[in-house]
Amino acid sequence: MADFYYLPGSSPCRSVIMTAKAVGVELNKKLLNLQAGEHLKPEFLKINPQHTIPTLVDNGFALWESRAIQVYLVEKYGKTDSLYPKCPKKRAVINQRLYFDMGTLYQSFANYYYPQVFAKAPADPEAFKKIEAAFEFLNTFLEGQDYAAGDSLTVADIALVASVSTFEVAGFEISKYANVNKWYENAKKVTPGWEENWAGCLEFKKYFE
């Protein structure tokens, strides 16, 4: 069984948990207390010198960055390739959505909310505009689509639903974006492990109360 270093409230960690559920892989979950500096201990730095979560250790093979872990789990353990198809064009669209999630959507969350939550900084209206722009892009991608990349559930949906659910508990108004809202309601029903994702979201919500 693969060791999985994580925090339940972390959106990237939750995307891996849902992906593991989708491919039927059990994870040996190991809570890492970042506030206590457990990620900076020599034994963890040996595993991941970048000292980030999530981190997966599968039979001695260590990997971090959630979207890389998602793809690895599907390629190694998926019974089919439906979550990450081998077709170059289909895969390219999924990759684009994953990079969009990492570099634009989730990044906009981190840039706006983290300074307020962890450094008690005032809200930055310019950073909030970046969130709105990211949701406008996602809304456009989802025009006429039930899924984020193609016509069935993929790792792109799983990564995005982890991010979008985090925006929801932070109080962002997702319902303003009709296509995102429709996709999100469907994703809640069809994404394996959604319940555990939502439990993690509620744990994260305490930072916004």
Swiss-Prot record:
It holds the Pfam family GST_C. Transmembrane segments: none annotated. Conjugation of reduced glutathione to a wide number of exogenous and endogenous hydrophobic electrophiles. This is Glutathione S-transferase 1-1. PANTHER family: GLUTATHIONE S TRANSFERASE D10, ISOFORM A-RELATED. Keywords: Transferase. Homodimer. Residues 1-81 form the GST N-terminal domain. The keyword Transferase applies. Belongs to the GST superfamily. Theta family. It catalyses: RX + glutathione = an S-substituted glutathione + a halide anion + H(+). It is an enzyme of class 2 (transferase). Its EC number is 2.5.1.18. Glutathione binds at residues 51-53, 65-67. One of its GO terms (biological process) is glutathione metabolic process. One of its GO terms (molecular function) is glutathione transferase activity. Residues 87-209 form the GST C-terminal domain.
